[in-house]
């Protein structure tokens, strides 16, 4: 089979390419370049010029062809612009999930199927695919980021390292002397390039001061430094004095008011998802929703569907439910789908 491997220049995708070549497949390394400048030193991001170079070196060592696609404009239109627009409207977006849908996983696979006649696109994600279904990996699970990937895209996606641990992957890389064997993981939002989120957003959004108001008493407690700097559930950095811990519970973008309150004002017993992406049918029980990467899954009582939204009723109240984040629904370890929290 002809298998393209989305190579980020990291150890996971490099070992994925090696394993597929060892299995006898025709492997092509594909790297996306999203920007031309280098990042800050020690920035834990991917898709930089240095990552492109690392991917090319690995492909040369493995004896497989390597191509680079300059998708800077596409990435800006589909991910960065979405990210900035979301913050401008008071949302807290998840750019990695959007990128997997619209750029580097689902769309890249579709693009290569059309232009290079590949059979599959493989990535280094910690995801298990069994019988066409996406399941949680045993370690460093990244299935949450696949919640928006269309069902039809799964036909041509594969995840060779999904069953492996990070240590097993690094051991293989060291055994075959890959130069990226000890490369640090990319964890930051890549297009921030090591910048602080507030500094990045201040380039595009007017950070005007406004009132911090208690949600229950309606008393003004202080001034915020720009409403877009804060996210739902945030406790630290509010700059107000109060006799109880306070959290960000609501943002009024039009009036530029940041509402805060005690933890009970964060509690939600239902979550609404828009633009729901169905991967599998809902089950009667044992379903959970995950509302942030690495957050604890929340048991679901039942689900109501209508023309525009999916409403998730919870068995226990959830906190830190931020509009704009991805809500991923699971049945046990199986990913059923996901949407944008609204």
Swiss-Prot record:
SUPFAM superfamilies xref list: Adenine nucleotide alpha hydrolases-like (SSF52402)
EC number(s) stated in the UniProt entry for this protein: 2.8.1.13
Keywords: ATP-binding, Cytoplasm, Disulfide bond, Nucleotide-binding, RNA-binding, Transferase, tRNA processing, tRNA-binding
Region annotation Interaction with tRNA: where it falls in the sequence: 140-142, 292-293
Subcellular location: Cytoplasm
GO biological process, one term: tRNA wobble position uridine thiolation
Gene3D superfamilies: Adenine nucleotide alpha hydrolases-like domains, HUPs, Translation factors
Domain of life: Bacteria
Annotated site residue numbers, Interaction with tRNA: 125, 325
Keyword Cell membrane: no
Catalytic site: 99, 190
InterPro entries the record matches: MnmA-like, MnmA-like_C, MnmA-like_central, MnmA-like_central_sf, Rossmann-like_a/b/a_fold
Family assignment from sequence similarity: Belongs to the MnmA/TRMU family.
Protein name stated in the entry: tRNA-specific 2-thiouridylase MnmA
Organism: Hydrogenobaculum sp. (strain Y04AAS1)
